Regions:
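Bacterial signal peptide processing site
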Residues: 23-27
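Extracellular low-complexity, O-glycosylation-prone Ser/Thr/Pro/Gly-rich "stalks"
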Residues: 55, 61-63, 77, 87, ...
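C-terminal motif of bacterial Sec signal peptides marking the signal peptidase cleavage site
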Residues: 18-21
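Structured domain cores in non-transmembrane regions
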Residues: 40-46, 54-159
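Bacterial N-terminal signal peptides that target proteins for export
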Residues: 2-11
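Intrinsically disordered, low-complexity proline-rich regions
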Residues: 33-41
């Protein structure tokens, strides 16, 4: 009788043991944490920029390249920035290379002499619609420079090239006296904080007069005169 009376208790014990086995910590239904997707590799965008000096007697200072998404290096009729003034008066491009608007920048090596060319590579990640600006001083002048101002690159595909011609500009920061004391390339002063050009704004350059043309105090000869365009710029997207 006792055995028969204990059957319900035995059943309860078996059921309890079975249920406890279901919660032994090995829950195979636990959701797996998904692995994070790897970050995509950055898209490297590369350009080769070749600058040809088309003048007869004007060396170009170290060429400055800047990639940016907004802004311009200069505006006709407006004062030049100090960074541009330094390039136009002395060829010093250090300030221009680190402008706040620059997403990437590069500099040529040394002078690009008349009839010669220099190729510079500039790289940027994940941006295919940047603007390219280029600047260089016409070395034997008071404050003449040439370059590109915010040239859009969105339509330039890998393997394609564009060729553009650039004119000479006057930074409007130094009077065009052409005398030896004011032109660094002939032994005079380069950059000066004093702006003695009454216009104080960027304009198209009127050209060189020179001693051969009757300006007795000029340190320049007819060889340093120039016509537009003064440079040819070829932009190739290589990557």
């Amino acid at each position: 009788m006792n055995v028969l009376n204990n059957k319900p208790m035995l059943c309860l014990w078996v059921c309890a043991a079975s249920l406890s086995g279901c919660f032994d910590g090995n829950d195979n239904n636990t959701a797996m944490t998904p692995m994070p997707e790897p970050e995509p590799e950055p898209l490297m965008v590369s350009y080769e920029v070749t600058v040809d000096n088309l003048t007869q007697g004007q060396p170009l200072s170290p060429i400055t390249l800047i990639l940016h998404s907004e802004g311009t290096l200069w505006e006709i009729g407006q004062p030049a920035s100090v960074a541009l003034e330094k390039v136009a008066e002395s060829g010093d491009n250090e300030d221009l290379l680190v402008l706040d608007m620059a997403m990437a920048s590069a500099s040529g090596e040394g002078l690009t002499m008349p009839g010669n060319a220099q190729t510079i590579t500039i790289n940027i990640e994940d941006v295919t619609n940047a603007y390219l600006s280029v600047a260089a001083m016409l070395g034997k002048s008071n404050d003449a420079f040439t370059g590109l101002n915010a040239q859009g690159l969105a339509g330039l595909m890998v393997g394609e090239s564009w060729t553009l011609f650039t004119n000479a500009y006057d930074a409007g920061t130094e009077a065009n006296t052409e005398d030896m004391a004011s032109i660094g390339a002939v032994g005079g002063e380069g950059f000066s904080e004093v702006r003695d050009d009454a216009r104080n704004m960027v304009t198209m350059h009127p050209g060189i007069v020179s001693v051969d043309d009757g300006l007795a105090t000029s340190a320049l000869t007819q060889e340093q005169r120039f016509d537009n365009p003064v440079a040819r710029i070829r932009i190739t997207r290589t990557q």
